[in-house]
């Protein structure tokens, strides 16, 4: 089951996450969501908090602001994703914020499945659910997992 195709569930879950966000961040000027997974979640939380919300999307493999979106100098920006695993997409968003001379407030996601081994983000992540998922180097994969095909969700390599 996926909440992105069930708006009635997305609203409920995002309302709960929005409540956590409101307690942690007092002055949010803008929500930035990376495409694809963050768009619906970012929009829904922006709607609930009544905050301007934009998204960035990949152009030639690099996150870019398009469609007339911009981050103004001095804005307090919160990055919202559906799932944070390594933090790579979030860190690409951070670059857009810094290049605009705006301020990064932090990160929020429905699911935080990052670990100390994979996380590249230094700020705290607010999430609805924290999941501990072991990660393995290819050569150290347990035998019981070797026969299971690897899948890689996300949009990083979509052309």
Task: Provide a role label for each language-model segment.
Residues 36, 41-78, 88, 143:
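Short, glycine/charge-rich flexible loops or terminal/linker lids adjacent to PRPP-binding catalytic cores
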Residues 1-27, 156-159:
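Active-site-facing substrate-recognition patch
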Residues 29, 75, 105:
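Conserved acidic residues
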Residues 83-94:
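Acidic, divalent-metal-coordinating active-site segment for phosphoryl/phosphodiester hydrolysis
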Residues 94-159:
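PRPP-dependent phosphoribosyltransferase catalytic core
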Residues 3, 79-80:
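Hydrophobic Val/Ile/Leu positions in short beta-strands of Rossmann-like dinucleotide-binding domains
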Residues 26-35:
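Short glycine-rich phosphate-binding loop at a beta-alpha junction
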């Amino acid at each position: 089951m996926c909440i992105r195709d069930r708006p009635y569930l997305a609203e409920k879950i995002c309302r709960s996450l929005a409540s956590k966000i409101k307690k942690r961040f007092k002055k949010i000027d803008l929500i930035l969501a990376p495409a694809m997974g963050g768009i619906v979640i970012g929009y829904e939380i922006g709607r609930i908090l009544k905050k301007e919300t934009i998204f960035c999307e990949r152009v030639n493999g690099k996150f870019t602001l398009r469609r007339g979106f911009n981050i103004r100098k001095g804005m307090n920006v919160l990055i919202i994703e559906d799932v944070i695993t390594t933090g790579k997409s979030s860190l690409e968003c951070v670059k857009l914020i810094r290049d605009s001379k705006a301020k990064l407030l932090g990160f929020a996601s429905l699911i935080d499945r990052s670990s100390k081994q994979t996380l590249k983000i230094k700020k705290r992540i607010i999430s609805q659910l924290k999941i501990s998922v072991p990660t393995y180097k290819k050569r150290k994969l347990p035998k019981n997992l070797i026969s299971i095909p690897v899948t890689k969700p996300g949009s990083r390599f979509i052309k």
